[in-house]
């Protein structure tokens, strides 16, 4: 899904969840939205196809806010050091 489609889904009020998930070079954004037959989970894509990877969570926040959303979840599993025990 690309940003224009996300904006349409936001305006329709069918977006249920937005998740930022670590990728090799940054963060991918997954969108869960309602459909006629239930729910669907789609990744945010670049204009020319392929997964859109954001370098920072700030960049994710700007894109999410620009689409009309006010919140998203961050998953840290898979980050370097995320599974390390606290000192």
Predicted regions and their residues:
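Short Gly/charged-rich anion-binding patches and loops
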Residues: 4-5, 59
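Short aromatic-glycine-(Arg/Gly/Cys) micro-motifs in beta-strand/loop hairpins
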Residues: 20-48, 69-81
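N-terminal intrinsically disordered, cationic/polar leader segments
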Residues: 6, 11-23, 35
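Short terminal or interdomain "cap/linker" segment that borders an active site or interface and mediates
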Residues: 81-87
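A short, charged, amphipathic alpha-helix used as a generic interaction element across diverse proteins
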Residues: 53-68
């Amino acid at each position: 899904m690309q940003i224009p489609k996300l904006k349409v889904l936001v305006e329709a009020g069918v977006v249920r969840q937005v998740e930022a998930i670590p990728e090799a070079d940054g963060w991918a954004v997954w969108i869960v939205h309602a459909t006629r037959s239930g729910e669907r989970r789609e990744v945010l894509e670049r204009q020319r196809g392929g997964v859109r990877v954001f370098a920072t969570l700030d960049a994710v926040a700007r894109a999410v806010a620009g689409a009309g959303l006010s919140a998203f979840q961050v998953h840290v599993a898979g980050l370097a050091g995320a599974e390390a025990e606290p000192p």
